[in-house]
Design a protein with these regions (language model features):
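N-terminal leader/targeting segments and the immediate start of mature chains
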Residues: 31-75, 86, 215-229
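Beta-turn initiation residues at beta-strand->coil junctions
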Residues: 69-71, 92-93, 108-109, 186-189
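An acidic-aromatic
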Residues: 78-127, 195
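Flexible, surface-exposed loop/linker segments and immediately adjacent secondary-structure boundaries
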Residues: 119-150
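Bacterial N-terminal signal peptides
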Residues: 19-34
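N-terminal secretory signal peptides that target proteins for export/translocation
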Residues: 1-18
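Non-transmembrane domains of secretory- and envelope-associated proteins
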Residues: 41-42, 148, 160-170, 177-229
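Short, hydrophobic/aromatic-rich segments at coil-to-beta transitions
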Residues: 60-66, 84-90, 149-157, 179-186
């Protein structure tokens, strides 16, 4: 039986990951780019559908992203991820995550564990901080917010009764107005916590193979294996 875990983005541990299994909707890999009508949005040249589709095309070809995670009460943490269709690799201080399309693998150096699981869509979203950039459905109310010059900010609020983002009150995505590239993702939780991902660089990821989304035995040979499959 899995123990109860507290919600803690800043720890970036297996405890954090498993707590979020049922908390977040799998926006990363389900449905199409069916965008709900924008409520209260002024007429603008920025095309949200186009921006999301542009990011989707990058992911299909393979993309590498560097970012900084900030949350209340903790120091900023640098991280990077690369995405290739359904597969992804995520690296944060003390933690490495890999998904090869079927098995989710997590190396947690602070807890000295190597965890394997067959993930649900919620699991994948929980482990992929950039899932929120992609594929919101008609179950969201989307509004354009005031934003600094040169950027566009959209707020995504789950429709009442949908319960699509349990634990998350709403989230916001900031785009560069000229390039239409995502620049920042802010998550606002029901309990008042805010977690932000500031994207520094997005570039094509070359030389991706099936081995890019798994770990070599020497990387986890000294760790306790936790197989949840």
């Amino acid at each position: 039986m899995r123990p109860n875990h507290s919600l803690s983005y800043q720890r970036y541990s297996v405890r954090f990951a498993t707590h979020l299994l049922g908390s977040l909707l799998a926006l990363f890999l389900c449905g199409t780019f069916a965008i709900a009508p924008l409520h209260g949005q002024r007429k603008a040249v920025f095309d949200l559908n186009k921006a999301l589709q542009q990011f989707e095309q990058q992911v299909k070809k393979g993309v590498a992203i560097t970012f900084t995670l900030t949350s209340q009460g903790s120091k900023p943490q640098e991280g990077y991820t690369w995405l290739y269709g359904r597969r992804f690799m995520l690296s944060m201080p003390g933690m490495e995550v890999a998904f090869d399309g079927s098995t989710l693998r997590i190396i947690n150096q602070s807890e000295r564990t190597y965890t394997l699981m067959t993930p649900s869509e919620q699991d994948l979203t929980a482990m992929n901080p950039l899932a929120y950039i992609q594929k919101p459905s008609q179950r969201f109310r989307i509004t354009e917010r005031k934003s600094p010059r040169g950027t566009v900010v959209y707020r995504f609020v789950p429709m009442q009764g949908t319960n699509v983002l349990a634990g998350v009150k709403y989230y916001e995505v900031t785009f560069d107005q000229q390039s239409q590239a995502p620049k920042r993702v802010d998550l606002y939780f029901d309990l008042g916590e805010q977690v932000s991902y500031t994207i520094h660089k997005i570039q094509p990821k070359e030389h991706i193979t099936s081995q890019s989304f798994t770990f070599a035995p020497q990387e986890y040979k000294s760790l306790e294996v936790v197989d949840l499959r």
